[in-house]
Amino acid sequence: MTRDEVQIWFDNNKINGSISDEYSDTVAKGNFVSQSITANTVVHQGDKMTVTYSLGKEPSTEEKNALKKAETYSEMMHMSKQGIYNQLTSSVEGFTKEAAQYAIDNIDADWKANALEKAKTYQQTMSMSKQGVYNQLTSSVEGFTKEEAQYAIDHLDD
């Protein structure tokens, strides 16, 4: 059962249920790990039950640090996915490609919002045209996708 299906089952059966997550070296991310009540046990309304899902393998310290650094670049500098990856793997930051990819795969970022914030900065501080902003956003320097850059241009005057 998916997490959503488990929650619906809890609600429909009036079970005092919770869903938790834990790292697992043997169970793939998102898959079922365990439940607090043994399978085939009759449960009653109001019973407490926890179902646990896997977060996948626990990240290394380097992966955790790369993710924290990526979050900072996203939140403070409104960088693109590609820009963050390039920065993390640069000689300045020195993270491995694997740690940088882990960060990119696990960051909770709104890339379109980042593109918009970066576009506003270019327009306000450098007096750039919309086409110039678009070109800058999609350049190898900034690394936003065409879709992210177009979103930024479309919402620049909102």
Language-model features and meaning:
Residues M1-E75, Q82-N86, S90-G94, Q101-K118, ...:
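Ligand-recognition elements built from short beta-strands and adjacent flexible loops
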Residues S74-K81, Q123-K130:
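Extracellular glycan-recognition/adhesion modules and their associated mucin-like linkers
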